[in-house]
Amino acid sequence: MIGVVDYGLGNLFSLENALRFLGADFRRVSRPEDLSCFDKLILPGVGAFPRAVAALRETGMFEALKRAEQPLFGICLGFQLLFTSGEEFSLTEGLDLIPGRVVRLEGPVKIPHIGWNSLHLCRPEHPLLEGVREGDFVYYVHSYRAVTAPEFELAVSDYGQTVCGLAGKGRVSGSQFHPEKSGDVGLTLLKNFLEKRF
């Protein structure tokens, strides 16, 4: 059973449609005490880093996610929350499950970064990337990017700067792009998360 973390800031409709298409057994989870009922967790999110952290703290989900032992996959803002800190509006502590910080995209490119971009696979052997090819396109919507060590970067995109598109450390991974909006490539990645062992 997959738990989709619902803390009031995720647009869950597209993600749930993708999970349904893949035949996944899932339900939303909003109480920290229920996390242990699930085999794997997905942390979506749309909006601002500080507001998301505040929402997770208010429900007790922040500390619960830090303690959780299941595989966890973050998407977009949920991906950014996996890192040590975020610099949106003010410096805010993240979940610190993957070392790194979240910083604003730099010009002269258009911000936010909206649209399709190609992937360079840093670790093509990683289970999440099985069936994903060098140069495959995925769909981004974001104004901030994660800066992390190369050892945690699974795939990156070029947008006038390196954008960490996919990162992972142990049981924790996530994507800055939206796999649920990235066609067959995104579905492949989600399927890998559902089926592979981490």
What are these regions (language model features)?
Residues 1, 26-37:
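Short acidic low-complexity segments
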Residues 2-24, 177-181:
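N-terminal beta1-alpha1 ligand-phosphate binding loop
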Residues 16-17, 53-56, 84-87, 152-153, ...:
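Short amphipathic alpha-helical segments
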Residues 35-45:
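Short acidic/histidine-rich motifs immediately flanking catalytic phosphotransfer sites
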Residues 47-115:
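Cysteine-nucleophile active-site neighborhood
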Residues 84-161:
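Pocket-forming structural segment of enzyme catalytic cores
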Residues 161-169:
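Short, surface-exposed beta-strand/loop micro-motifs that present aromatic residues
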Residues 175-198:
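Acyltransferase
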